[in-house]
Amino acid sequence: MKYRFIDHTADIAFEVYGSNLRELFENAALAFYDAFVDTSGIGIEREVGVECEGEDVEITLYRWLNELLYLFDTEFFAAKDVEVEVEEGDGVKASGKLRGGRFSAEMVKVEPKAITLHKFRVEKTDKGYVAFVVVDI
């Protein structure tokens, strides 16, 4: 399982899984787009590069999702395919390629307002990583 949606009053929450950080960031992007737009009608029209960094994995994933929200809001862009490289060192850096296209208003399931820090967390487990994300709608 890559991700699952969780009942959450007045927000959308999802739990994301990855055997490594690359997979966690890729699956977080797929969960984000699946939550808010019907991607079945979107073709792969272009590739968008996204980079972000932070002092730890949680902050970097939070910033990653905010970059996706920015593209969603400003360019009406949704990805169907995602590739991410995550580097750990002096902080954490994520560099990704999003492949997808524009969506129309009819394709939007619900409009996201903000990625919240409420209950936001990333945990390392014996199977990899788990992240819990709440998005204000």
Curated annotation (Swiss-Prot):
InterPro entries: Archease, Archease_arc, Archease_dom, Archease_dom_sf. Ca(2+) binds at residues 11, 136-137. Keywords: Calcium, Metal-binding, tRNA processing. SUPFAM superfamilies: MTH1598-like. GO terms for biological process: tRNA splicing, via endonucleolytic cleavage and ligation. GO terms for molecular function: calcium ion binding. It holds the Pfam family Archease. Belongs to the archease family. PANTHER family: ARCHEASE (PTHR12682), PROTEIN ARCHEASE (PTHR12682:SF11). Activates the tRNA-splicing ligase complex by facilitating the enzymatic turnover of catalytic subunit RtcB. Acts by promoting the guanylylation of RtcB, a key intermediate step in tRNA ligation. Can also alter the NTP specificity of RtcB such that ATP, dGTP or ITP is used efficiently. This is Protein archease. It comes from Archaeoglobus fulgidus (strain ATCC 49558 / DSM 4304 / JCM 9628 / NBRC 100126 / VC-16).
